[in-house]
Amino acid sequence: AKTENKTVTVRQTASPIXXXK
């Protein structure tokens, strides 16, 4: 489940970076 957790963290981090694409 470590890989899934990392994917979720990256997705949440990319969300603000994208700025709401």
From Swiss-Prot:
Which residue ranges does the record annotate as region Disordered? 1-21
Q: Which domain of life is it from?
A: Bacteria
Which keywords does this chain's UniProt record carry?
Ribonucleoprotein, Ribosomal protein
Polar residues bias located where?
1-15
**Does the record bear Ribosomal protein in its keywords?**
yes
One cellular component (GO) term of this entry: ribosome
User: Partners and quaternary state?
Assistant: Part of the 50S ribosomal subunit.
What family is it from?
A: Belongs to the universal ribosomal protein uL30 family.
Q: What is this protein called?
A: Large ribosomal subunit protein uL30
Organism annotation: Brevundimonas diminuta (Pseudomonas diminuta)
Tell me the organism's taxonomic lineage: Bacteria, Pseudomonadati, Pseudomonadota, Alphaproteobacteria, Caulobacterales
The gene from which this protein is expressed is rpmD
